[in-house]
């Protein structure tokens, strides 16, 4: 009811936010798809795309709000799976939950001096590591190398790219505000 009233009362503002949200989501999905177009070694691709994705989650949160950022956080693992970057389908909810916690922690800590830079990526990395471990236990995956690779991918890169993505978004927002 309130949403309808707002939509009728403030149509240009509502439309502007809807359009901006759609553009931010489209840009994030396009950046995530770079790995399909630009052939990069896996480690470079992981850290570059991961940083850009975390930057877009942060920018979307700050420019369009929590709802749009949470929607983006849900779409990203689905597109990663469709692109072949998420090998185990049971990891989809793990990545979605990690993105959700990242966005919510970032929204909560945005005005805290250094906590916003470190805590959301750390919480996401720990949560995704625990979630991936649970999934691998459920699957009873025996191959030690595959287990190690998946557990690493769900932890350390999330922490590093999360911090880098937040820092990049902050620098970009500073530049945008000066324009």
Language-model features: locations:
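Loop-helix junctions at membrane interfaces
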Residues: 1-179
